[in-house]
Design a protein with these regions (language model features):
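Non-transmembrane, aqueous-exposed alpha-helical and coiled segments at domain scale
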Residues: 1-281
């Protein structure tokens, strides 16, 4: 049976999600930060992690953004195939929600309308929107503001099949080493393996929206996540890039089938402010 959803409901929810995501970290991220502060072996690193916790508390109490870079709005829409939208075009409804959220929430406007001319759009639109059609009559919205200190440190590697899993490990470590302090560690590392050039990047982006206390349900991928987190934390980059045992809070890996001639790997890095909010309509 077809279910009708008014697109102004999409606008309303995305507006609220933009504000919420920029003011509060999810429970899994908050717990990971607390655990990192408890287990960090460097005194300076521990001090930095405690300061980051203080920052989160102040943002919560005073209703101000966790970070001055309130990001480019990345929206994932999982639309049930039995949903019919009425009202404005869905893309317009999404962008209107972002516009209202960033304007009424007094969030920094960080989007330029053209990558070469570079004039600010003054309302943080347009968003980057990813659609997928799924069974059912619901719409799942994931709103993830992505700051560019860490985004600029992200990489895509087009490996050869002969590079194998060791090549994948090397690519992940190379991306994190090159990022160093510029990605505002402790970081969350999203990895996409497989697909095509663009698919592996999308997999990596989606991996960042998975709770950091959840692993892949594929056993050997779960093992790889745990191994890479351990190796990354042995690099000594540490909180704020000033040394320590907490360079990353999590490594989340997504995989997809790929061509016999390729092994694409994308590493999408996020800082400790790994923001995302999920709602289902």
């Amino acid at each position: 049976m077809i279910r009708t959803i008014q697109t102004d409901e999409i606008t309303k929810n995305i507006k609220e999600m933009c504000i919420q995501a920029n003011h509060y970290l999810s429970a899994d991220m908050d717990a990971a930060m607390k655990h990192a502060a408890d287990t960090e072996q460097s005194e300076l690193g521990k001090k930095i992690l405690n300061q980051l916790q203080d920052n989160l508390k102040i943002a919560d109490e005073e209703m101000i953004p966790i970070c001055q870079d309130t990001g480019m709005a990345v929206i994932f829409l999982e639309v049930g195939q039995d949903v019919h939208f009425e009202g404005a075009a869905i893309e317009d409804a999404v962008n209107e929600g972002v516009r209202q959220g960033y304007t009424e929430g007094f969030l920094r406007k960080s989007v330029v309308g053209d990558p070469l001319i570079r004039e600010n759009t003054k309302d943080n639109t347009p968003a980057v929107i990813h659609y997928s059609i799924v069974p059912g009559d619901q719409v799942k919205i994931t709103m993830a503001p992505k700051g560019f200190g860490s985004e600029n440190m992200s990489r895509v590697f087009m490996l050869k099949p002969a590079d194998g899993i060791e090549g994948v490990k090397h690519a992940i470590l190379t991306a994190v080493k090159d990022a160093g302090p510029n990605a505002c560690p402790p970081m969350v590392v999203g990895v996409g393996i497989g697909g095509t050039f663009e698919k592996c990047a999308l997999l990596a982006k989606q991996a960042l929206t998975r709770p950091v206390d959840e692993h892949s349900d594929i056993p050997y991928v779960k093992d790889l996540e745990e191994e890479m987190l351990s190796k990354i934390n042995q690099l000594g980059i540490g909180p704020g890039g000033l040394g320590g045992t907490t360079t990353a809070l999590a490594v989340n890996i997504n995989t997809y089938p790929t061509h016999i001639a390729g092994l694409p790997v994308a590493v999408n890095i996020c800082c400790h402010v790994n923001r995302h909010v999920v709602r289902t309509l």
